[in-house]
Amino acid sequence: RSYSVTGVQTCALPILVPTKVIAVGLNYADHARESGKPLPKEPLFWLKAPTSLIPDGGKIEVPFAQHRTDYEAELAIVIGRRIRNVTPAAAARYIFGYTAAQDVSDRTIQNSETQWARCKSFDTFTPVGPYVETKIDPHDLTIQLFQNGQLRQNSNTSQLIFNAYHLVSFISTNMTLLPGDIILTGTPSGVGPIESGDRLEVRIQGLAPLINTVK
């Protein structure tokens, strides 16, 4: 089904299981600085388990109460066509659209390991939705996260070190991307811990808000 939201064409995001969920790290300079990490010279990415996906309205479940677990607001790319070795200039033709997402992270585990797949792949750690916007420029969008009504993250996708088209191109040189695959483009500064009962809202300019609560 399609919807008209402020004149922008959108599609409902079903409960889908893509072949891949790809997360990109340290893609905003301010977040890299707050993490104490050097700026990447090329996109830093890893795979998240597709079973970590939940929709708008779903509940985030923290597996270890004693661990610090953080919210991370992100713009998500939804792939529309099979891609292999596409150039940045051609990348837009292979993108179905964009939606709001979170890359929830068990920071305690992340800080104890050199790989990030485990700390970000727990069930419910990738909220996505509620709709995919199919006609929107991804390069200059305000991105915000509100925790219980308080603004915690506030940036713009123009601050991405590697923009959406560059990411699609780079990742496609390393692996084939298939329709429905999701790329999380990175989070800006302001990440912080979540607690049971929290209401988290990701607002990205031109996209429907993504709202989830913490169980």
What are these regions (language model features)?
Residues 16, 23, 55, 70-72, ...:
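Residue-level recognition of short, solvent-exposed, well-ordered loop/turn junctions
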Residues 1-11:
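Single conserved hydrophobic/aromatic residue that forms the stacking wall/gate
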Residues 14, 20, 67-69, 169, ...:
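Residue "hotspots" at secondary-structure boundaries inside conserved domains
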Residues 31, 37-39, 107-215:
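Catalytic-pocket segment enriched in acidic/His residues
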Residues 3, 65-69, 119-123:
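Short Gly/Pro-enriched turn/cap motifs at secondary-structure boundaries
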Residues 48, 73-75, 79-81, 99-104, ...:
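Short, structured patches in soluble enzyme cores that scaffold and shape functional sites
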Residues 84-98:
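N-terminal accessory regions of nucleic-acid-interacting proteins
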Residues 12-64:
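Extended, compositionally biased flexible segments
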